[in-house]
Amino acid sequence: MKKTFTFLFLFLSVVGFAQEVDLEAIHRIKQEGLNNSKVEEIAFRLTDASGPRLTNSPGYKRAADWAVQQLTGWGLKNATLEKWGDFGKGWQIEKSYAAMTAPYYFQISATPKAWTGGTNGPIAGEVTLLAIEKEEDFKKFEGKIAGKIVLVKSGANTNPTFEADASRITDKELEKMAKQPIGASSRYTPEMIAQYMARRAFSRKVDQFLINEKAQLVIRGRNGKHGTYFTSNGASYSADAPPAIAELETAPEHA
């Protein structure tokens, strides 16, 4: 039995080393990837040229139409768009501008929150800082924010930073990543998930409070630093969803 096993092992080893490498094919693959790549052009057409591409938005349609046209131009047959189901409302920014006018003029970097409402033209109003962190805080603002611009403070860290924004992964870190088990358990514990769900529920309650109290506009500070901030969606895209209050997101330094 031992001899049979040794024979098979040697036979497989010989076959493995006998395979010839097609260097010409490898060269052509490298040539296409390194010198003839269209990745940058494709990315430009789908992003900068098409604009924001929320589902069912005009920007999404522009990007999809370009993709069909490009695929057809490359020789693919029957490149078409197919409807996959009923999504809901589309959304896009038509015009957006925000500024502080007193005690002096200051332009604010702010972006409308996806699927929130508009203002139907320029608006102005008194600004109120909303600080609701627990149930007892709601009483403090009842009847005090109607028709006002409500500023919701950001929880982001705005302290100065002294480390580079980017860094290279060391060989030791790469070795540790390579040894990480496949399918390793989530870094989020049940307690962390429960806390996240509780924060989401409380945030929705605050949103409904702002609607009930008839705030004119909401401005929220978002996570980010050095003037860069991350945007998100703030309302339902369902076709039958009620209109949402107008809402902007701004850099944490402004909130």
Question: What spans do the regions from the language model cover?
Answer:
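Positively charged n-region of N-terminal signal peptides that target proteins for export
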Residues: M1-T4, Q19
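Sec-dependent N-terminal signal peptides
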Residues: T4-V14
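Noncatalytic luminal/extracellular "stalk/propeptide" segments of secretory-pathway proteins
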Residues: E20-V21, F44, D48-A184
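N-terminal capping segment at the start of a domain
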Residues: V21-S57, K225, F230-S236
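Solvent-exposed, acidic/flexible segments
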Residues: D22, E32-E40, R53-A64, G121, ...
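Extracytoplasmic/secreted proteins, especially bacterial periplasmic and envelope-associated proteins
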Residues: E24, R28, K38-E41, R45, ...
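A gly/proline- and charged-residue-enriched helix-loop-helix capping module
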Residues: E175-R199
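Loop-rich non-cytosolic ectodomains and luminal regions
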Residues: P190-A194, A198, F202-S203, D207-A255
